[in-house]
């Protein structure tokens, strides 16, 4: 699985996974500090700043382990949208700065799942120093070194 997830990463551009292709080039206009925009304004912002069609908005105030918005400051607005192919895409908007902080599509969800497998952290998908990864990394190195040794030692006998 480690190799399969690594292959997956090498064939998918991180920019596409992060949803850059859905953003329009626009000016950044911030609201006065401390003023939180209304949910309806969040829908309009996403319509203006992306090529996506906003459907609904939910305010997120609690952090959840392994969430699509992990590592972001809360609160956030999660705007549920669809693209031209009617695929559901979540856009996360900072309600104070009106900045889009994350775009999460099915492509991102697959990437995130593969990342969790690749680093062997299935819950948070943030810990690249866990025991499983260290053990399997050492085993992979030993396997590679023994393969190189066997390759060269078998050629000498011929």
Q: Where are the language model's segments positioned?
A:
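Conserved histidines in hydrophobic membrane contexts and catalytic metal-binding motifs
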Residues: 1-158
């Amino acid at each position: 699985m480690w190799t399969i997830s690594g292959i997956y990463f090498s064939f998918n551009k991180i920019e596409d996974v992060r949803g850059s292709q859905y953003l329009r080039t626009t000016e950044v206009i911030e609201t006065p500090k401390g003023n939180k925009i209304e949910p309806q304004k969040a829908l309009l912002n996403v319509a203006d700043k992306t090529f996506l069609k906003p459907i609904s908005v939910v305010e997120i105030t609690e952090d959840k382990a392994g969430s699509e918005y992990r590592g972001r400051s809360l609160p956030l607005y999660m705007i549920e949208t669809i693209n031209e192919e009617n695929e559901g895409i979540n856009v996360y908007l900072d309600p104070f700065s009106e900045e889009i902080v994350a775009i999460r599509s099915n492509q991102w969800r697959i990437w995130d799942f593969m990342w969790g497998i690749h680093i062997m952290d299935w819950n948070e998908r943030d810990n690249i120093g866990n025991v499983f990864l260290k053990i399997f990394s050492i085993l992979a190195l030993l396997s590679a070194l023994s393969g190189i040794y066997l390759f060269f030692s078998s050629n000498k006998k011929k």
